[in-house]
Amino acid sequence: MDFIFTLFYFRFLRESSFRNLLYWSKLQRTPRFYAWAGISFEILAMNHISQVKQRLGIAGVSTNLYSWRSKSSGEADERAAQIDMVIERGDNTINLCEMKFSEGEFAINKDYDKILRNKIARFMEETKTRKSIQLTFISSYGLQRNMYSGIAQNEVVLDDLF
């Protein structure tokens, strides 16, 4: 957790004089803030892997935890892909974890559904895995139910981490 505060300090506090009383109010809606919040949320989730496993019902299953990035980029439909967290399980299942910080329920739309399907396809193709793949969505407040939300077989929310 110290790293999250250190990241926050160097991003927002170190060069601030705090003379502007609205500094924090204005900062909260900037791309810079959301980038920090996203990275911090990913670190938080990774630091709470025991709670993630508990929520997934795999607390007693041996696992390897890592991030993954595809080796190459192909055509538009086969772009390079990156998986935030991979949980490779001893029961021949792999959870591909997509992590998203949001201020409410996260909505998967048609374009994002295509990105997620590409990530799964690239992972399976490049790793040549024969294990069962489950997309797991880790987010602040869960997924908004819509025609695309069914792509995620599992869901973990911020409250599950504590």
What are these regions (language model features)?
Residues 102-122:
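Mg2+/Mn2+-dependent nuclease catalytic core
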Residues 54, 58-59, 122-130:
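Short mixed-charge
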Residues 129-162:
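Domain-level recognition of nuclease-like catalytic cores that cleave nucleotide substrates
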Residues 1-83:
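Accessory nucleic acid-recognition modules appended to NTPase machines
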Residues 49, 81-103, 116, 135:
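Conserved catalytic cores of phosphodiester-cleaving nucleases, focusing on short active-site segments
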Residues 8, 94, 144:
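Flexible, glycine-rich phosphate/dinucleotide-binding loops
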Residues 12, 98, 108, 147-150:
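Short conserved micro-motifs at the rims of enzyme active sites and ligand-binding pockets
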